[in-house]
Amino acid sequence: MNIELKLLNKEIIKEVPEYGTEGSAAVDLRACLSEAEFLSPGECKLIGTGIAINIANPNYAAMILPRSGLGHKKGLVLGNGTGLIDSDYQGELMVSCFNRSQEVIEIEPMMRFAQLVVVPVVQAKFDIVEEFSQRTIRSAGGFGHTGV
């Protein structure tokens, strides 16, 4: 699958997103900053990546995810949990960064700070009904219904 990638900041050409290994599911995104940004404990900031993508196929979307090591070791996670990039969005990829630690986190220019994965999407057609056509064993059992 080919996705068009637009460089919005010429500095990013030095570090164009690419897969790290043959088995990598995601590409790293870099912080397109002219100087370091500092996140205080509990603070959330939007950081640009300097790139835009054109997926152009409604059967796919992209998801921005945190980098495992940064979340676990430093406390840098996404402020919105997951960033969903629709196939028709063509603006700059922005990352909502949240500091869940008790220490100030420094985000350096061109630092790998999030990752992007392309995923298949199915657009469902919703049929409005009075009752479902079949009842499942779980039915309306909600959070923790299966034991957790």
Curated annotation (Swiss-Prot):
Carries keyword Aminoacyl-tRNA synthetase? no
Q: Which GO terms describe its biological process?
A: dUMP biosynthetic process; dUTP catabolic process
Which GO terms of the molecular function aspect are on file? dUTP diphosphatase activity; magnesium ion binding
EC number(s) given by UniProt: 3.6.1.23
- Write down the chemical reaction(s) this protein catalyses: dUTP + H2O = dUMP + diphosphate + H(+)
Which cofactor is recorded for it?
A: Mg(2+)
Record InterPro entries: dUTPase, dUTPase-like, dUTPase-like_sf, dUTPase_trimeric
EC main group: hydrolase
Highest taxon of the lineage: Bacteria
A Pfam family that the UniProt record links to this protein: dUTPase
Show the SUPFAM superfamilies listed in the entry.
dUTPase-like
Is Metal-binding tagged as a keyword?
A: yes
* UniProt: substrate binding residues: R67, S68, G69, N80, L84, I85, D86, M94
Q: What does this protein do?
A: This enzyme is involved in nucleotide metabolism: it produces dUMP, the immediate precursor of thymidine nucleotides and it decreases the intracellular concentration of dUTP so that uracil cannot be incorporated into DNA.
Q: Which NCBIfam families does the UniProt record give?
A: dut, PRK00601.1
Q: What is the protein named?
A: Deoxyuridine 5'-triphosphate nucleotidohydrolase
| Protein species of origin | Francisella philomiragia subsp. philomiragia (strain ATCC 25017 / CCUG 19701 / FSC 153 / O#319-036)
- What gene codes for this chain? dut
